Amino acid sequence: MKNYIEIIDVSARQVLDSRSNPTVEVDVILEDGTTGRAAVPSGASTGIFEAVELRDGDKSVYNGKGVLKAIENVNTIIAEELVGMNVLDQIAIDKTMIELDGTDNKGKLGANAMLGVSLACAKAAAEYLGLSLYQYIGGVNAKVLPVPMMNIINGGEHADNNVDLQEFMIMPAGASSFSEALRMCSEVYHSLKSLLKAKGYDTGVGDEGGFAPNLNSNEEAIQVIVEAIEKAGYKPGVEIFIALDPASSEIFEDGKYNLKGEGKVLTPQEMVDYYANLVAKYPIISIEDGMAEEDWEGWRLITERLGTKIQLVGDDLFVTNTDRLTMGIERGVANSILIKLNQIGTLTETLNAIEMAERAGYTAVVSHRSGETEDTTIADLVVAVNAGQIKTGAPARSERVAKYNQLLRIEDELGEMGEYRGLKAFYNIKK
């Protein structure tokens, strides 16, 4: 087996994501015929500091969401440079694309074009070496199965209802294995569905497979989840915890937080009080994007108030970007980063962000996007880096379930070497 294996072809095509929007899929072929394929996800509530997702803008085709320009960039500019390169040198591949793009936000080539190529190269390399993707990326120490952060009630941008906060999730941190954690979540999901039906609520699902009932308040969403956990036979706050993603940047207007569904307009301090009240009443272990991406003072307030009690995840705040994360670490805000590959655009930069977070004592939560495909890269990534937490939707809709099923396969492959850390995955909580 050679330590230099040439890339002989890089090509992209337009495929559909789970919201019926076009996205980029890339094939990378090696000199021995080995192929790697990756499809790129897309977000609905996107941070303003994210790398650029290149869309065509022609309203007559796919409502302007076509990605033919990104595909052309893969098939010409990127392919011309990468053909002949060593697929086993991921850093050189990603560095070459970053230099080809030449912008600070992937605005020329598009993060969707670059990420598709980056991941397809990694998959081709793993296939050539006869390794699982998590083994190739993480090496012999890749062994930690993640605690799922499972979205079971959708609101905000992910659903057409009057619930302001975007995601209400469950985390089975009290499970003893990943497969048990998944079973617990599935049982709570079914329990929740029957409860919602009994209460006369709609059980249609949102983009990520969670239910999207027209509840009266955000607190009612938490209450019905607690009820569903108990109905399924589990103890809230012992076996299963609650996580929230308010996606606060979406409700931040003129320096205040507008909870339209509840008829409230709150200052940053009042918003922190709102969360603190919920944390005191319910078994909440994690809040993501509790404050808006540009509300640094709000982030300081929430970190002072809750930063030793619960996990505070920065998504729009950090956008998987080491420059943004450095600012957060220096200012002492948040204690966790959400990792979304397409926010930054290459595997190398993603790994750098995870490493920086962990060195600073921040956890890293590997995440899907609301527009997903059958691609399961993030399941391998979360094990590769021993992150210990994954956010990839409800146990419904096959683009979500694909990731969970891949994790079951990895758990099976690791056998006794595999480790499910449960509450130990929250090393950022000091209480």
Swiss-Prot record:
Cofactor: Mg(2+)
Localization of this protein: Cytoplasm; Secreted; Cell surface
SUPFAM superfamilies: Enolase C-terminal domain-like, Enolase N-terminal domain-like
InterPro entries in UniProt: Enolase, Enolase-like_C_sf, Enolase-like_N, Enolase_C, Enolase_CS, Enolase_N
Catalytic-site annotation from UniProt: E208 (proton donor), K340 (proton acceptor)
Domain of life of the native organism: Bacteria
Alphabetical UniProt keywords: Cytoplasm, Glycolysis, Lyase, Magnesium, Metal-binding, Secreted
Single GO MF descriptor: magnesium ion binding
The protein's name in its UniProt record: Enolase
Gene transcribed to yield this protein: eno
